């Protein structure tokens, strides 16, 4: 009995336990679905931040803060920065450091993943106002705040290992900047100085056998160099100058110009110090062989090193070879009389800051003293009234008078020779805002040095600083106080050029010619070339078949105008469209009492001269300074006295087997050997009626013919053909009007003799063309017409290139339409000369043998361009259509529950692989868990993405799988179909879950699948428990 009872209790307990366990399993599995969904959502928040961010488009960068509220789970805000619509990168400014999610022990470490042009499945669960471009990604089931935009870019955070404690954020912008930095990083080359061969080198003085630095004169270093093959970007060569010269003169810019091939920089120059100059090749030197360079560099006497007159040995060393020259240096003593000497020089000139420094010497002469002396310094040109006060320092020279540097250089930091007495001049020195100063001395019995630092008016084209002294000589006998005073004036000016050709457009003597020759080693053979061609203002780089050596000289020899003698300073900058060799130095100061002088700022030799009048109370030497070298400009600013202003003293030019071709504005000069051909072939368009006779003039074998056909279809002026032959100099002007219409007026067709036949030159070839007839004109010819013929000797010659080609044409093209080519129709005296009939509606018979038949309308020189790129299909309009065919979506809410049980079959259903498959992962029930698998499935639907809009009916069945949220768009009356156009792929990986678990979570019904098994299992337990209980009751009854 006890045993039975115990057995029964045991059975009872087991049965009760089974029932309880089964019930708990059933209930628990039912709740497990909700818990799993909540957990997945929370994990998504943790991993994906705020799922996806769609910014409502803005043309500037916008920062959107998206907040996810998911039931009772924790949420956080993430700041996401989106680029405009064309951006492909989204960066996370700040990643959360600690985000707690249910059932997650590790903090999420976020990393921005950038995927370009990879599809992502999206579903819109909110009404869309701008349906045309709007695309949204909804990865959260409940309340989600989204910003809508035209360009969707998603950040997906991937969990990292537990060992990484700090969030790691990859900013694509930083990566891009780093990449640019790496691209710009300097390429270190090798020293190829040892591979440079000095074929010739010399140092020359353009002004003769001496150099006057105060007159802007300088010497020129000329090199002809040859380089070994295999030069690469970053390779460099050095050469060293002696310390008694520099390459910049008074300019504060310490640079040397670039060596260019046309406008392409082949090598950049820099000053290393201690007289070392380095040229570094750019990537343009790649694949060049047989490279040679002709360099000319201006060298200015350094006033600090060379302080007195005398001979100086100037040297330059390159690859162990020394080029040298010994030349006398003569400085200008300034202006003086028996009592006082005044001298001065512009020490430095800074074009960028509009500032300059000036040094003035004031010293008594021959032991004589002066009373009541007044010294003034004034900007007579370029005064800046709105500028600040200049800085004026007065120094007393303590050394011997004969030791004062003749170069007008003052090392005021040397207190043994220079004493600052500016404070002692309190009340005697006054400075004005307009840049002037005045110093009043009771007695001039000491030598003073005045250092001036001021600024000139920005944009001023002329700067002139005048130092003027008024004084009265001291008398031995005071009773004889009646005497006259004296005045000494010294001007230091700077003439600024905009580096344009002078106003007259004349060309002066060529002094500088920097060539850079090479051969291109890119074909099977070698290709010689150079960027030069027809270098006119509008064209920087043209190709021409004719080798051209181009040099521009923008100064006019002997040009003057300033009695005091201005010094011209040329500052050659790269702003010129014609990057060739410009020279603006005046080679002779003819017509100047004081003499103009030039200084070059780039690579041009600079001519400086300063007058040394002893008989004048007004002395000035002005330095003219030129900045740019675009043809068509003129002199712009002035600077006086001995200023060697040279910022860039070398002008490198590449001329590979090219030149003898100079083009200025619209005038073309072609020089072939000794033959000069000037060709002007652009005449006004012919409109109106061709009227009047055509003249023919032959003078001393100079054949000038004016001929032309009017516009035969409507109105037309006749063009003019000028053909002049004199000693191989041919000037041609030609153009014919339209043909093929009505022709009125008196017209004539002319033929020349063989001797007077004009020559047409194209390139270097001379082509002789004979026409036996004129074109047949279809239309009406009105008025009296005549045809004139000359002998065979007058037949014109057309020259192409350097070869003379005789071409006999039996006829010219038959013209059926409008032909506006520049054609010259000439006939020879052949026996079979065609017959011409005139009068109204008269026809012209002639034979046509050689030239093709021309039909259609040709107006002038025409260029036909074809665009081979097919037009892009209107793909953007396709996605806008799927939204309209989705009216069946209202049926979605009616069957929201039915799709859930058959979910296991969803992956096997054909609808899933079809274009609608992207909708499966984006279902609102479990959008976040499927996110990790989104990339796997969207890859297949990527090709059919254009088919989604084409077959709007198919997306309807998957829409049925949206049980809850589809109801909202139905209420709004708008239907949204999935769009697979996101440029970034969403990836989310749970830190602790395996890939298999994720696969089970892919469909929304994944959780329900496990729930059904649990319910079955729990039900079995409950049935077993009930059976045991019933059995137990039966046992108890027994």
Curated annotation (Swiss-Prot):
Main localization (coarse): secreted
Coiled coil start-end: none
4 X approximate tandem repeats, as annotated region: 741-898
LPXTG sorting signal (motif): residue ranges: 1002-1006
Modified-residue entries (Pentaglycyl murein peptidoglycan amidated threonine), positions: 1005
KW Signal (keyword) present: yes
WR repeats (start-end): 899-912, 913-926, 927-940, 941-954, 955-968
Region (Fibrinogen/elastin/tropoelastin-binding): 189-507
Location in or out of the cell: Secreted, Cell wall
Compositional bias annotation for Polar residues: 39-92, 122-164
InterPro entries: Adhesin_Fg-bd_dom_2, Adhesion_dom_sf, Fibrogen-bd_dom1, Fibron_repeat-bd, LPXTG_anchor, SDR_Ig, YSIRK_signal_dom
B- repeat feature ranges: 541-570, 571-600
PROSITE patterns reported for this sequence: GRAM_POS_ANCHORING
Ranges for region Disordered: 37-193, 736-804, 825-976, 989-1015
Ranges where the record places region Ligand-binding A region: 37-507
Signal peptide: 1-36
Entry membrane topology: Peptidoglycan-anchor
Key words of the record: Cell adhesion, Cell wall, Peptidoglycan-anchor, Repeat, Secreted, Signal, Virulence
CC annotations in GO: extracellular region
One GO-annotated biological process of the protein: cell adhesion
Span(s) of short sequence motif YSIRK-G/S signaling motif: 7-18
Sequence segments annotated as region (2 X approximate tandem repeats): 541-600
NCBIfam families in the record: LPXTG_anchor, YSIRK_signal
Name by which UniProt lists this protein: Fibronectin-binding protein A
Gene source species: Staphylococcus aureus (strain Mu3 / ATCC 700698)
Gene field: fnbA
């Amino acid at each position: 009995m006890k045993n039975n009872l115990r057995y029964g209790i045991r059975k009872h307990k087991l049965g009760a336990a089974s029932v309880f366990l089964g019930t708990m399993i059933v209930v628990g599995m039912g709740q497990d679905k909700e818990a799993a969904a909540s957990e997945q959502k929370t994990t998504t928040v943790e991993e994906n931040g705020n799922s996806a961010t769609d910014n409502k488009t803005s043309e500037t960068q916008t920062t959107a803060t998206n907040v996810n509220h998911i039931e009772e789970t924790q949420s956080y805000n993430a700041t996401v920065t989106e680029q405009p619509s064309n951006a492909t990168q989204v960066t996370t400014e700040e990643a959360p450091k600690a985000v707690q999610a249910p059932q997650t022990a590790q903090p999420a470490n976020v990393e921005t993943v950038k995927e370009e042009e990879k599809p992502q499945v999206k579903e819109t669960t909110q009404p869309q106002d701008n349906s045309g471009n709007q695309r949204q990604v909804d990865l959260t089931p409940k309340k989600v705040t989204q910003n809508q935009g035209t360009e969707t870019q998603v950040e997906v955070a991937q969990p990292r290992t537990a060992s990484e404690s700090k969030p790691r954020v990859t900013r694509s912008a930083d990566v891009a900047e780093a990449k640019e930095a790496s691209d710009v990083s300097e390429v270190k080359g090798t020293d190829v100085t040892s591979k440079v061969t000095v074929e010739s080198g010399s140092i020359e003085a353009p002004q003769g056998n001496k150099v006057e630095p105060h007159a802007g004169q300088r010497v020129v270093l000329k090199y002809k160099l040859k380089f070994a093959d295999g030069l690469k970007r970053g390779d460099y060569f050095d050469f060293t100058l002696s310390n008694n010269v520099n390459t910049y003169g008074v300019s504060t810019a310490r640079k040397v110009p670039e060596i260019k091939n046309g406008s392409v920089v082949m090598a950049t120059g820099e000053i290393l110090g201690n007289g070392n100059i380095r040229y570094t090749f750019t990537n343009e030197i790649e694949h060049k062989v047989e490279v040679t360079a002709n360099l000319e560099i201006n060298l200015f006497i350094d006033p600090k090193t060379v302080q007195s007159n005398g001979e100086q040995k100037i040297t330059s060393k390159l690859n162990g070879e020394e080029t040298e020259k010994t030349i006398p240096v003569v400085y200008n003593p300034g202006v003086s009389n028996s009592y006082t000497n005044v001298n001065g020089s512009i020490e430095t000139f800074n074009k960028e800051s509009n500032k300059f420094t000036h040094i003035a010497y004031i010293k008594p002469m021959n032991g004589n003293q002066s009373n009541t002396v007044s010294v003034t310094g004034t900007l007579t040109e370029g005064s800046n009234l709105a500028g600040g006060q200049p800085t004026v320092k007065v120094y007393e020279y303590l050394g011997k008078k004969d030791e004062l540097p003749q170069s007008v250089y003052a090392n005021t930091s040397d207190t043994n020779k220079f004493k600052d007495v500016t404070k002692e001049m309190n009340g005697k020195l006054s400075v004005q805002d307009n840049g002037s100063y005045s110093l009043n001395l009771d007695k001039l019995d000491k030598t003073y040095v005045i250092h001036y630092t001021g600024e000139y008016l920005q944009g001023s084209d002329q700067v002139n600083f005048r130092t003027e002294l008024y004084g009265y000589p001291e008398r031995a006998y005071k009773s004889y106080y009646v005497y006259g005073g004296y005045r000494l004036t010294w001007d230091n000016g700077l003439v600024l050029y905009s580096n344009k050709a002078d106003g007259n457009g004349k060309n002066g003597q060529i002094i500088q010619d920097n060539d850079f020759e090479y051969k291109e080693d890119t074909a099977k053979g070698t290709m010689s070339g150079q960027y030069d061609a027809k270098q006119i203002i509008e064209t920087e780089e043209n190709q021409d078949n004719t080798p051209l050596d181009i040099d521009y000289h923008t100064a006019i020899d002997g040009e003057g105008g300033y009695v005091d003698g201005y010094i011209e300073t040329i500052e050659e900058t790269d702003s010129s469209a014609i990057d060739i060799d410009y020279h603006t130095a005046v080679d002779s100061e003819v017509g100047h009492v004081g003499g103009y002088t030039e200084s070059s700022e780039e690579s041009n030799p600079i001519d400086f001269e300063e007058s040394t009048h002893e008989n004048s109370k007004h002395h000035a030497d002005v330095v003219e300074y030129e900045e740019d070298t675009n043809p068509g400009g003129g002199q712009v600013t002035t600077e006086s006295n001995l200023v060697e202003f040279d910022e860039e003293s070398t002008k490198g030019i590449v001329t590979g087997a090219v030149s003898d071709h100079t083009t200025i504005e619209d005038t073309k000069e072609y020089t072939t050997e000794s033959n000069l051909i000037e060709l002007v072939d652009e005449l006004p368009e012919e409109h109106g009626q061709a009227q009047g006779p055509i003249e023919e003039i032959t003078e001393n074998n100079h054949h000038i013919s004016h001929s032309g056909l009017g516009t035969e279809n409507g109105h037309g002026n006749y063009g003019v053909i000028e053909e002049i032959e004199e000693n191989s100099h041919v000037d041609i002007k030609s153009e014919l009007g339209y043909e093929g219409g009505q022709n009125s007026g008196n017209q004539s067709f002319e033929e020349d003799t063989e001797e007077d036949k004009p020559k047409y030159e194209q390139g270097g070839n001379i082509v002789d063309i004979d026409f036996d007839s004129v074109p047949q004109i279809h239309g009406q010819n009105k008025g009296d017409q005549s045809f004139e013929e000359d002998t065979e000797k007058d037949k014109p010659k057309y020259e192409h290139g350097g070869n003379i080609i005789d071409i006999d044409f039996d006829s010219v093209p038959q013209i059926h339409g409008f032909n506006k080519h520049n054609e010259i129709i000439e006939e020879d005296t052949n026996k079979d000369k065609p017959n011409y009939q005139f009068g109204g509606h008269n026809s012209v018979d002639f034979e046509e043998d050689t030239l093709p038949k021309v039909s259609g309308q040709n107006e002038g020189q025409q260029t036909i361009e074809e665009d081979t790129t097919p037009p892009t299909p209107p793909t953007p309009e396709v996605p806008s259509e799927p939204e309209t065919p989705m009216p069946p979506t209202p049926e979605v809410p009616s069957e929201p529950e039915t799709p859930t049980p058959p979910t296991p079959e969803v992956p096997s259903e054909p609808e899933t692989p079809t274009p609608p498959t992207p909708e499966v992962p984006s279902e609102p029930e479990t959008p976040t868990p499927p996110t990790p698998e989104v990339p796997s499935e969207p890859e297949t639907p990527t090709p059919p993405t254009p088919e989604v809009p084409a077959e709007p009916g198919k997306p309807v069945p998957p829409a049925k799988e949206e049980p809850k949220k589809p109801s909202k768009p139905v209420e709004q009356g708008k239907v949204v179909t999935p769009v697979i156009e996101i440029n970034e792929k969403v990836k989310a990986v749970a830190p602790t879950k395996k890939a298999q678990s994720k696969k089970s979570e892919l469909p929304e019904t994944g959780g329900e699948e496990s729930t059904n098994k649990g319910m079955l299992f729990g039900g079995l337990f409950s049935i077993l428990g009930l059976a045991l209980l019933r059995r137990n009751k039966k046992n108890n009854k027994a």
